[in-house]
Amino acid sequence: MKRILFVILSTMLLASCVLPEATQQPAPVTPVEPKEKQETTPIEPSEKVLQPPKIQSINWNGIVQPLIEEMAKAHGVETGKVLLVDSVKNNTNGSLRTLKATEAIIDAISNKHIFQIVSRSQIHLARQALGLSTEDSLGLRSKSIGLARYLSADYVLYSVVSSNKGQRDLEMQLMLVKTGEILWSGHRDIN
């Protein structure tokens, strides 16, 4: 009870304290006359509308076909084995239609009848089981090999589009899933 009484009295004492009012003079204001008006020409709005950048169409089939031919002749590649074609990664600063590139790779391999290709539905189910989102382009070779092991694939085809001084290249690597050994590697200019 004494504490409450002490707090109330302290509050009343502090509330009754008043600081003396400061007697400061306001800052002097000096009027400034405007200078001569300069004539300005109004800026006319431009009627020119900029064109959006054109999407460059890339002939993925023409780029991929020679690489698949090379891969089919590579030493150590056995026909009839199961292949996981990983989606193409875009390591450029521009936009690319990597889905079309991946489809071109799958079509070229299917036409050669070299491998049994893991279906998209199996890949989708495996990604869900492993907790990988469908937007995850795997990005790392280790993730690609892990997914291939889960799917019991024998090979993984890892593909990356990279850019160096304006020159874009498609690099492909065929890897053995058991060891991670790169059996074949090839690249081709895109531009």
From Swiss-Prot:
One of its GO terms (cellular component) is periplasmic side of cell outer membrane. Keywords: Cell outer membrane, Cell shape, Lipoprotein, Membrane, Palmitate, Peptidoglycan synthesis, Signal. A lipid is attached at C17 (S-diacylglycerol cysteine). It holds the Pfam family LpoB. Gene3D superfamilies: ABC-type transport auxiliary lipoprotein component. Residues 25-48 are annotated as: Disordered. PANTHER family: PENICILLIN-BINDING PROTEIN ACTIVATOR LPOB. This is Penicillin-binding protein activator LpoB. It comes from Xenorhabdus nematophila (strain ATCC 19061 / DSM 3370 / CCUG 14189 / LMG 1036 / NCIMB 9965 / AN6).
